[in-house]
């Protein structure tokens, strides 16, 4: 089931959490809501869940208007960062809880509940742990129980609010791969909130970048990283060098050299060029002359910081570890192979 967000607005006193957001979430996709603290991503997730109400706008589940629906009527599975498990209940009882609190005809017989619980414990790879209590589990295992409980009610949509934020780095990486596998097996429309760029780019089908209550870009991880639509996206997703320049009769000039001007850039004026460290490459003949300030190996890569000779600007370069060593004072020549250009605030 797809979800449509139409002109959603939410104000908390003087703070604008959502400023008229429009977003289409496709059926069966895994969408990441990525942004800094205060960008509106968690507020948007809570409004989709029915835990928060918008001041204006609509939330549609398929063709059904869910804006005023209760949490129960929406049939949403929700997973929080801090598990929200019942400490006094076993793993089995936690997973069964949502099914047991149903009333009337909606209530399943105990045999069906039991079958569903064991099916989900197998899905989340917790077979044999049904009688343990949350305090007897690791953080990663607790989050798996939380997901099984969210899936038990057969939700139409699965929502996750920074589900791996409380876990250490290695466990987060393992659970990311596992969650992707679970999603592919269930086919549920899934939305998750994160401030971790690596997590969003690795896990999601598409990423929605939020900033100050608005959406900057919605695109595939590859497009968000390689073709950002705004300076904010360039700066927020991944490392980037920013260099001032100008567009005039001679084309795009940055730090003393003329570069190819992107066709979508219309007009003349002051601009900023954005180039990622891995997109600055060594060239024997063309480009900027630069002086190495320092270099450092980082795993399979080498990071080099250099100052452009004809300007006061410094850049970071990321090179393959197979390249030579670089020492302070060494001269290089650099050329950007891929970059983005945007008019600066003072530009036309």
UniProtKB/Swiss-Prot annotation:
GO cellular component: a single term: ATP-binding cassette (ABC) transporter complex
Segments forming a coiled coil: none
Keyword RNA-binding in record: no
Coarse class of the protein's main subcellular location: membrane
InterPro entries referenced in this protein's UniProt entry, alphabetically: AAA+_ATPase (IPR003593), ABC_SmlMolc_Importer (IPR050093), ABC_transporter-like_ATP-bd (IPR003439), ABC_transporter-like_CS (IPR017871), Mo/tungstate-bd_C_term_dom (IPR008995), P-loop_NTPase (IPR027417), Sulph_transpt1 (IPR005666)
UniProt: ATP binding residues: 35-42
Subcellular localization, as worded in the UniProt entry: Cell inner membrane
Keyword field contains Translocase: yes
Residue ranges annotated for the ABC transporter domain, each copy included: 3-237
Molecular-function GO terms, alphabetical: ABC-type sulfate transporter activity; ABC-type thiosulfate transporter activity; ATP binding; ATP hydrolysis activity
CDD domains the record matches: ABC_CysA_sulfate_importer
Keywords, ordered alphabetically: ATP-binding, Cell inner membrane, Cell membrane, Membrane, Nucleotide-binding, Sulfate transport, Translocase, Transport
Topology term for the membrane: Peripheral membrane protein
Catalyzed reactions: sulfate(out) + ATP + H2O = sulfate(in) + ADP + phosphate + H(+); thiosulfate(out) + ATP + H2O = thiosulfate(in) + ADP + phosphate + H(+)
Cross-referenced NCBIfam families: 3a0106s01 (TIGR00968)
Assembly information from the UniProt record: The complex is composed of two ATP-binding proteins (CysA), two transmembrane proteins (CysT and CysW) and a solute-binding protein (CysP).
Job of this protein: Part of the ABC transporter complex CysAWTP involved in sulfate/thiosulfate import. Responsible for energy coupling to the transport system.
UniProt similarity note: Belongs to the ABC transporter superfamily. Sulfate/tungstate importer (TC 3.A.1.6) family.
PANTHER family to which the protein is assigned, alphabetical: SPERMIDINE/PUTRESCINE IMPORT ATP-BINDING PROTEIN POTA, SPERMIDINE_PUTRESCINE IMPORT ATP-BINDING PROTEIN POTA
Protein name: Sulfate/thiosulfate import ATP-binding protein CysA
Source lineage: Bacteria, Pseudomonadati, Pseudomonadota, Gammaproteobacteria, Lysobacterales
């Amino acid at each position: 089931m797809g979800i449509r967000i139409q002109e959603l607005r939410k104000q908390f006193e003087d703070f604008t959490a959502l400023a008229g957001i429009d977003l289409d979430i496709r059926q069966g996709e895994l969408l990441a809501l990525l942004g800094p603290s205060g960008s509106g991503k968690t507020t948007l997730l809570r409004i989709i869940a029915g835990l928060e109400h918008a001041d204006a706008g609509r939330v549609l589940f398929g063709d059904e208007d869910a804006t005023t629906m209760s949490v129960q009527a929406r049939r949403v599975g929700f997973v929080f960062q801090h598990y929200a498990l019942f400490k006094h209940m076993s793993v089995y009882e936690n997973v069964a809880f949502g099914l047991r609190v149903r009333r009337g005809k909606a209530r399943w017989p105990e045999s069906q509940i039991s079958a569903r619980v064991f099916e989900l414990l197998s899905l989340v790879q917790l077979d044999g742990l049904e009688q343990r209590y949350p305090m007897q589990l690791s953080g990663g295992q607790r989050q798996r129980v939380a997901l099984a409980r969210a899936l038990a009610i057969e939700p139409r949509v699965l929502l996750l609010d920074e589900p791996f934020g409380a876990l250490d780095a290695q466990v987060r990486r393992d659970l990311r791969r596992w969650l992707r596998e679970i999603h592919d097996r269930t086919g549920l429309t899934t939305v998750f909130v994160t401030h971790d760029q690596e997590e969003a780019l690795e896990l999601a089908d598409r990423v929605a970048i939020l900033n100050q209550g608005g959406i900057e870009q919605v695109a595939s991880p590859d497009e968000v990283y390689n073709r950002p639509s705004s300076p904010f996206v360039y700066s927020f997703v991944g490392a980037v060098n920013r260099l001032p320049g100008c567009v005039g009769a001679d084309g795009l000039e940055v730090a003393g050299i003329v570069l190819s001007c992107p066709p979508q850039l219309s007009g003349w004026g002051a601009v900023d060029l954005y180039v990622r460290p891995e997109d600055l490459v060594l060239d024997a003949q063309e480009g900027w002359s630069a002086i190495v300030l320092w270099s450092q190996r980082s795993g399979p890569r080498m990071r080099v910081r250099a100052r452009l000779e004809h300007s006061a600007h410094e850049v970071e370069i990321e090179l393959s570890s197979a390249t030579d060593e670089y020492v302070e004072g060494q001269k290089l020549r650099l050329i950007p192979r891929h970059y983005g250009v945007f008019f600066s605030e003072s530009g036309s």
